[in-house]
Amino acid sequence: MLNLKVKMDGAVISMFKGEEGNKRILIYNPLSIFYLFLLLFLTIFLLPYLIFAGRIISYSLEIPPKAIFMIFLLSLFGSQVNLKIREARSIQPVLAFREISFFGVKWCIPEFQYGIRKTIISVNVGGALIPVLFSLFLLFYSIPALEQNLTVAYLKVFVAFIVVTLVVHKLARPIKGLGIAVPFFIPPLTAALASAVLFPIYVKTNPFIIAYVGGTLGTLVGADLLNLGKISEIGAPIVSIGGAGIFDGVYLTGITAIFILWLIV
C-alpha cells in the first residue's frame, strides 16, 4: 500500500493507494500538540453543557447518557477526518499574463484563459458520517424497540424527512470558495415543527426521534446531496459534506431540533 501526503491550503491530505490501484484519500486538518490540547480544553469547557444536554438528548431519544457522550467525543475528533467520495472537474476562467518584448522593453499583457479545476468531494466523519449512522441506529433499532405501530412511525419520519429536504433545498445556496450554505435556524426549526404536528397523529410516536432523524437526513439530502451539481460554481479545491464538524448544519440540526421541540411540545 502506498501512502502519500500532500499539503493543500493548510490541510494535510493523506493518500492511500491499494494494490489494485484504487485510491482512498483521507484529508486531515493539521494536528499538533497545541490543537489536541485545544480540543481537550474545549471538551472540558463544554462538560457542564454536555452533561445537561446529554441528559436531555438521552431522555428524549431513550439512549444511555454514556452513549450520547461517546457520540459527541467521536464527532469532535472525527471532525478532523474527511473521506473522499469522488473528484469533480469543471472548466474555470484563469487570469494569466503574457509577456511581450518590444525594443528591449518587456510588457505583461493580462488575458483570460480556461483551465480545468479539480474539486475533491468528501464526507466529514464527525459532521456527517456519525450523525447519519446514529440516525440509522434510531431508525432500525430504537423505533422497532420502542414503537408499537412501525408503519405509522416510519411514515411520520419519512414525511418529516421530505418536508425538511424540500425546505432546506429551496433555501440552500452555493457560496463561492466556501460550500453550500443555508440559514442555520431553518433546518432545526422545520424539523421541530414538522415533528410537533406529526407525532400525535393516529398513534403517538416519539417526537424527538422524528425530529432528529428527519432533520439530520433531510438537511444532508436537501443542502448537500441535491446540490452536488452546483459544485462547479463553488470553485473550491475541496468540498466536504459536514465539513464544519460539530458546528456543521447536518450535525447541529438534529440536536437543536430536540431542544426546540422541548419548548413547543
Segments (PLM) and residue ranges:
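Membrane-embedded alpha-helical segments in integral membrane proteins
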Residues: I44-I56, V132-S142
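C-terminal ends of transmembrane helices
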Residues: I51-R55, Q80-R89, I109-E111, L166-G177, ...
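C-terminal transmembrane helix-loop-helix hairpin of multi-pass membrane proteins
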Residues: F16-A53, S60-M70, V182-I186, A194-V265
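A glycine-rich, hydrophobic loop/mini-helix early in the fold
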Residues: R86-L136
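N-terminal amphipathic/basic-hydrophobic helices that include classical n-h-c signal peptides
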Residues: M1-M15
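Glycine/small-residue-rich interface belts in oligomeric ring/scaffold proteins
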Residues: I63-R89
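Membrane-water interface at loop-to-transmembrane-helix junctions
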Residues: F112-L129, T151-A153, L178, I241-F247
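Conserved mixed alpha/beta catalytic, RNA-binding, or beta-rich assembly cores of soluble enzyme
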Residues: A128-P131, S135-P207, G215-L220, L228
